[in-house]
Amino acid sequence: YDDETELYVPLAISESAELFKKDKEAQYISENNYDFLEESGVINYYKNNDIFLRPSMVSSCSYDIMFASLNAETPLRYDMNYRNYMLVTNGKVIIRLFAPKATKYLYSVNDYENFEFISPVNPWSVQDKYQKDFDKLRSIDVTLVPGQMVNIPAYWWYSIKFVKSNTSVCVFKYKTYMSALSISNHLIMRMLQRQNTKRVIAKRMVSGEANNAKEETETQNT
């Protein structure tokens, strides 16, 4: 985990698919794809078919779809939502779970800008410096194939491994008014963090402009 770098980079779906095919090191994951769901109209299928998943007194619904390179693994993390459903629609995944009491051994990092709670520990290949603490933990592995779904309780740590090519996972997350109230301190921290974060966007240059700038620089130096 590196808070000096961006966790997410926006890419077109065609570019992402090509990236997954070429990736031989299992390091690319695509998530936070709500814009894609909305622009493609797929979001309507989520909303029209999740009635039996929604809890009563729901205050917010979050939908996503995940893709990844073969054998890629998501960071170890936990969610604070009231319900967190993962539905495999293609391929196969293994989800490794840890109970909330494991938090003190997982070196939790609170990223309020992205509202993520991540551990630097890799549960699939534990780093040497974390091995001693990790040996104290017990995990549960859940394997999902197309048509199968799991509900990951709030505060349970999980990491998803994509063990087949072209795997896709539909994600449904819900907050109720009471669950939102119970995590209000974290929601306030997210609001403050976003207000205090300043982003500077660099000017985008096409290749012609870049060459001209290089020629001007060389002329000035001579």
Feature roles, as predicted:
Residues 1-149, 157-222:
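N-terminal accessory scaffold of Fe(II)-dependent oxygenases
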